[in-house]
Amino acid sequence: HAGAVADLAEQLSLPIEGPHRDDEFWIEGMPEAGRRYGFPPLRSFTPDRWLSDGDTVTIGTMTLDVLHCPGHTPGHVVFYHAPSKAAFVGDVLFEGSIGRTDFPRGNHDDLIRSIRSKLFPLGDDITFVPGHGPLSTFGRERQSNPYVSDRVAR
């Protein structure tokens, strides 16, 4: 998901914010991953700012809270906008599913813990935007998601 970051930042003269430093190994490995999977050449990069839990990121007039939610990757971050009750969760949570944890340094237990301890406490009425697929709410997933619903043993 970050293969063009270095080129875009250079072309548009934009700073790179994030990810969390725990994903540095992914960034450093991008050139090799690109070759392995037949992508055009990918460049690694060094962010202008690594993101940590509790940071904020401002885009235009919107300020987003940063939540470090490891599991899918160790440095995965979620962006939360309290005024609009929206969370941009990437590949942590999906409608009826959760993110993969079979990547290097992914961890299923960390992912479940991130969802239950960082995301669900934000409120059942929070709409989330996943990295793929339809929108949902934390409340809906607490009710019916077979991986993290309240009915699943902890």
Which sequence ranges carry the predicted segments?
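Active-site HxH/HxHxD metal-binding segment of metal-dependent hydrolases
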Residues: 1-58, 143-151
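Metallo-beta-lactamase
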Residues: 26, 32-35, 56, 62-68, ...
